């Protein structure tokens, strides 16, 4: 018992050291170090006994160099009240103000005399209650807004939370003026005056969610923009007519296509026509606030309407596509895509402000275009800042390019890539100064009701995690929709942060025009059939206002239809005049042809230049404290540069990067942990061990060089890869690389590989030079750390769509990276990259192999053929009994095993580039060994790796050279369900077995 009491005493004496007080104690300690007399004597004694270094104490108090400044935000009265209902601060603030007013004679009681202290207390209580009621409307008003055009959604149980009675006001108080300190733009207001503003602002056809935002400036801006007696949604007569005109265009276009192409899929905008005037407003207001370019990404719903009414794509071109015509000239090859996937670009001008618009081509996989659009926007923003920029481009510069994403309600709530993109929005390497998200919320996903497609009240709720403001709006009130679009655009341009518009509307017909929605939504479609269109409702409103007559509206509709008829006739003979895919940033590039040797590019770098770059790679500023292991790494690299020997993988990569930035090609390397490299091999970003400041040797190669950026990405594959692909679409003169942490994880982004990287050029005439670095190799690390699934990339290869390589030397890696920039066309490159080879004594190159006339080799010879100091000397070609062909790391396993066994009549030939397949080069090499047995050896199981892909090619080559053995024999792991074993003993047994199969008698 005594021991228990003793422990309690110790606890009582030291409880102030509880972790939650740490920040406070550190600040106090720093204060003590500055001036011991500035703290309480007890604290003085406590700190004196610690005897810490004064500088360390101050550093601790300041916190880490990477911490966010002014964060967390100091809790204000309103924030406290939100969390714990403590309104005392607010009451004190109001009481002080009222006392001040009473002293100046500005506040009087009911009799006209100065306020007594009781009256001040009562007035302060009234003020606090009124502010509590106002706050309730800000927090919960959106739940009571009139958002559903069909009126089908159930009203939430509000528990009287918005009723004045809930805050202590009875009808007897309604005529009393209450001090509200300009909270609603009024200093004093009666309860009915407050309710009038609050209901109009928060419970009309717009519902705003913004109280989840922690930045007081952003919250105050929204309040100031929408609250107040003069903040009604108001448009001039011209503005209203312009809205009506765009609605008539949107509705008329859909109806016209419905008549002309009955039953053809168009994924119409019927029921959501307010989108079109809203987009016009975004373009117009954005242009006035400095936007130079808007990049759209959207799904199929309403796409043709956006293309024609917003992007200005000629209607005749769309009608030409409806009758089965191609969107590209006849001389452009490509497999094409359906109408509602195609992109477009145009220039629009409002009030003298030119804005370039582009709509990104996309697949049917919903929301996957989002990161692509963001990546494109980032690249355009970087181009505005210039190739020699540093890595901190001002957000005001970035804001000139606006990514605008249109979503469906079910997809926004359902697709994980949406949350991934929101996660990217604030990151230094991926931010785009705010994306504008517009949800076309037709309250259904194909045939699924919202109750079954999301667990939250709104589809937009996922956006709350990044504190984006959300404007819910009724699509049958076009003025409210346009107003919401205007405020959202202004918020983005002011704060450079994402913002969401959630437009409640409906889908007048089925998911597509051949669909019958009443099977699954009978009540909804009964209501829709009885519901007037948005054009009818808005026309009725303007007629009632006396702004326009029915005859004028009929005339507007007739003129629009006449215009569409003219375009329809022109569409019958329409011919696309040129493909736009090599315009702008792509000017000077061409389509690749199949001629073999022209594809190498001049990739060698003069020896002198390599040495100069190498010197810069190992230099750090004098006062920079390098980690001792990193210093060793730099010293080793300096030695390599001095001798020109032993160039390892990471050094070859840095030399390739250094030479490219020196030549003016920016480099963007992104992925998980790429600064250091998963295997601690890269270290292109160095950290000072004292200050944590960064130093990047590759950005200090020479004056006027292009930028090198290594971006440690968030832990996502899908959104990050989509983003980097988008970046590569906008800037063909930047080398863009994405590295998977292990190649095994690349399939987390499979949609991007399937829908964009492998097929984008054939479907949409869009080239990309993106490089994917996928660590691959069997080293006994188990099924998720061994295989980048080489077979999958090869299965996608056809029509010269991309390159797949599995190189074995640093020199070849150097050349293949430079080759991406040194040709006048662009192709994606899928690279199997090494793990154990990063430090393998044989996997090294010389500087000579990077300079002079050297270049990339698609096939590499047996090292024993040319290196005289190797352990074995090969027989002459005629005496070689077997040729073992292989690709990647397994070459070194075979080489060492052959040396161990003293075999001199087996030749090892490496296929470094698997696609495009080097057939001619292979014919030349294998002609030397016509009588030898041919073996394909791989470390992957038989149903994986390159075997299934390469077997028919090799058979064709053997037939072509009239080889003695017309079939290639397989040596490798047997077929397996899992890519690799997790047991080291089993891994080694499998390795020994297939090496015996490949090299044994």
Swiss-Prot record:
The record's keywords, sorted A to Z, are: Glycolysis, Oxidoreductase, Thiamine pyrophosphate
Q: Which CDD domains does the UniProt entry name for this protein?
A: TPP_E1_OGDC_like
Q: Give the molecular function GO annotations.
A: oxoglutarate dehydrogenase (succinyl-transferring) activity; thiamine pyrophosphate binding
What the entry lists under SMART domains is as follows: Transket_pyr (SM00861)
Biological processes, Gene Ontology terms: glycolytic process; tricarboxylic acid cycle
Tree of life domain: Bacteria
- The EC number of this protein is 1.2.4.2
Query: Which InterPro entries does the UniProt entry name for this protein?
Result: 2-oxogl_dehyd_N, 2oxoglutarate_DH_E1, 2oxoglutarate_DH_E1_bac, DH_E1, KGD_C_sf, ODO-1/KGD_C, THDP-binding, Transketolase-like_Pyr-bd
Gene Ontology CC terms = cytosol; oxoglutarate dehydrogenase complex
Family matches, as HAMAP family:
SucA_OdhA
**What protein is this chain from?**
2-oxoglutarate dehydrogenase E1 component
Q: Which organism is it from?
A: Brucella anthropi (strain ATCC 49188 / DSM 6882 / CCUG 24695 / JCM 21032 / LMG 3331 / NBRC 15819 / NCTC 12168 / Alc 37) (Ochrobactrum anthropi)
